[in-house]
Amino acid sequence: MNQIKSNRELYLQYSASAPKLLAHVSKLLIFCRNSGISIPKGIRNIFEFTWEELINDPAVPTASEIQDLVVTFGTPTVVLAEVIPVQVLPMQKKQPPPAPPPTLMPAATSGGKYVPPTSTSAKLMPNGQNTLHKFQRQSIHLLTELLSLKMKAMVESASAGANPLDITKRFVEASQLLHLNAKEMAFDCLTGTVGKSCLSTAQLGKESSMNISAMGVNTPYQLVYQTSTACLSFSLCTGKESRKKDIGAKPKPVDDVSPQPVRARTPPENTVVELPDPCPEAREKLQDMCRHIEAERILWRGRNASCPMIFRNYRSRISSHLMLASKGDSHHPLTTGTQITASAPHQPSSQHAQMGRHSQEWKGPKKPIKLHYTFYDGSSFIYYPSGNIALLQIPTCCRGKPITCLFNDMPNTFLALFNAEGLGCVYYNLKNCCPYVLVLDEEGGITNDQKGYIVHRWSWASKTETLLSLEYKVNEQMKLTVLGQDSITVTFTSMNETVTISVSPKSCPHNVLHDKRPVRRISLMDEKVSKTNRALAEIKKRFQKTVTQFMNSVLLAAGLFTLEYPNPKETETSRVKLKPGSNQDRIRKTSLYQGENHMRIQSARQDSIINETLKEDSILTSLAHVQKKNGKVQVKVLPRGKRREVRSPTRWAASPSDCPLVLRRLILKEDIRAGCKCIVKAPLVSDLELERFLSAPRDPNQVLVFGIMSSQDPTLTAQLQWLMDTLYSHLQQGRSSPCIQCRHDPYRLLRYDLDSPLQKDPPLMVKKFAVIHGMVLMFAGGKLLFGGCVLNGYGFSKQNLLKQIFRAQQDCKMGYFLPDNYKFKHDAFKASRIAKPCGLSSRGVPSQFLGLETEPSMSTYVTNLDDTESTKKPPSDDYEGSVSSVALVDKIEKEPPPSPEKVKPPEIELQPFTKMRRSSKKTAGFKKLNSKK
């Protein structure tokens, strides 16, 4: 309590010495003007200093490596800890009383700009100075009484616990206790001096009329209480001041002007208001505005929002300085221009330029430029002179918890952010590697340089070394000042206007208290624990997914789990109504027979030297560094789980067309709830759903591999059946619904049975492509890519089948497809000699090699375009010999022997064939079978 009382006494002492200081400053200004010394307009009034700025002893700043940053560290003092939190808030409420002093001098010297420059104005300097000095003495006396009344009202309100907003109203009531004798004394002193100066010389009528209009007041002051801003203002002017328009006309006699103030002071004080109103229309409009503002204030008070509204524009103080300069220098026109150009003293001075600039600044902008606007809800806005927002402060839950944003003087440029919890960050206003220059939190703060290195670090709770002060120039107009965790301010200065906003963390009853806020403390151990928890969560998801897939596979194999498919009616309407010729619309450009055959022959010769020691199972994962004679070619086949899938822009959902069995049941209007059961063997495709299955939407780069089977004689296609089953089981391992889950695989394995009861007579494959048992067909996008009995130029094996699928994929990407009317021609080997005792003869060639011809070129397989003779021949003649090799040999023996010119030795004829088949493990078995036959 002793500290608080001493502060009040100190404040009373400052208030008592303020009028003397103001008088001294006024004399100094008069002396500077008379001497022709230009004074800047940005002199700060002593009453604008806050209590914190007056009592704090600024520490010595330390040099910082960051530009525009001044940081001071040291041991925290007791004054900062005890005095600032207690005295900052009460003293901020005591700032309104000193507001009137800045208006004394402009109001007292108003009207000076209307004096035309004359040569005789210099003679009035002594009289004008005496008048000004007497007026200042009376103003100081008035200011002293006002300050004493203000302090008395504040002490009474503080002791009684009244609302601080009612202090100003009490001040108005207390001001009425002033003696009327003091007012009359000031009036007599002022008017007496003016009268003497006016009657002394008859040639100075204009000057006397001007002085009378300014000094002829009925009372020394008139207090006006503004309810919108809760502020007081007083003026030393009367209603006669509105008649300044008559100054330029004829000067009125002194006798007509001087008696009016005398008549105004003789009646009682209550009759002064009865003077004629100079502008009733304007007064009515102002009264309407005041009533509207008061109604809004009452409305917001009901909403628990009692923040006063502030509408502050630029040049509000500049115009008052201009009024002061013009009035004080009415007798010296040359110094007027000097005062106007005080903000730019290095500019050349000229009378005409100065007077022109004076007139322009006096008129001011037609539309006021916004500076600082504050509304009832607590939101505050500060603007640049250009109109862009510099500072934005919006309350969250109440006025005490705002969010503050700082912006640069250009659109969409963010500088800083502060919230009510004490978190904040300040960005560099230029492009740097590290965007943050300052970061604040509950524990402390750090400052970073442009490269991101930490320059300073401090803690609010430190007892030995803490932050004493920090100043950072955010840009040319804004400066951030940090004196503690509870004292963070942003100062905006532009065009001699200064606005200070507090961004300190505050507490409110709607949220957690400031001292109970959770502190963010994340150590290295916590980071490790969080990483471990994330890894465990990922492992848990994988395990659950694997177990779910395994259970679905078991249930699906047991018939206890079925897949849900779309409504059969909707699927039937969208799929069954396809036109028969829709497959022809998907045809791309076809390749010529010569180019296709030449490419396949060359690829077969290059791959003939591939190392056969590679394991067959490793082909599914990768084929790398394949050696050739002239160089190394790297062939990479990624694993099934990591294949680079080339998908079309549209992704297909699960549909019945993915599984041939489900599609067949859908066409037959059977129940499809059983779902897909193609887990062990490749799905069997019949003629009933073949066209629709090929034309169904799927990945255009997916290769459909059809194996032509025979159910009546399984021994003819036993090797192909075993190869398809082995590869299919390895490909679909672990899948609960293979037909749906293989939509994005590079290839699919399918079966086509020529002897199935669901096939037509003849089957579609035989009718369209003239296929036989044991052949392999490959489709992509509904078009044929490959067909034959010999894979990759050698025969049937898993390695050769995968290589042939890879070639088909490359052909599909290049757009090489076989024509739609393409039919395969199957001729037996032409041999002229009888088989040798070893058993190797043309009759012993198995049915899998029925695509070969014994020409000198020894091509892998021969494909001819369908001619007119082949189309007339019935399809039964084409594949009748492929069913049994014995029937084929009998057919060959009945043919006439060839001519001697075409007959070749068997050594020359069979040498390339034996060389090519040397690496095949299946040749020995065929030789033994032929020898037995």
Curated annotation (Swiss-Prot):
It is a single-pass membrane protein. Pfam families: FAM194 (PF14977). InterPro entries: FAM194_C. Residues 343-353 have a biased composition (Polar residues). It is found in: Membrane. Residues 915-933 have a biased composition (Basic residues). The keyword Metal-binding does not apply. The chain crosses the membrane at residues 771-791. Residues 244-277, 343-364, 890-933 are annotated as: Disordered. Its main location: membrane. Residues 244-255, 890-907 have a biased composition (Basic and acidic residues). Keywords: Membrane, Transmembrane, Transmembrane helix. One of its GO terms (cellular component) is cytoplasm. PANTHER family: SIMILAR TO CHROMOSOME 3 OPEN READING FRAME 20. This is Uncharacterized protein C3orf20 homolog. It comes from Mus musculus (Mouse).
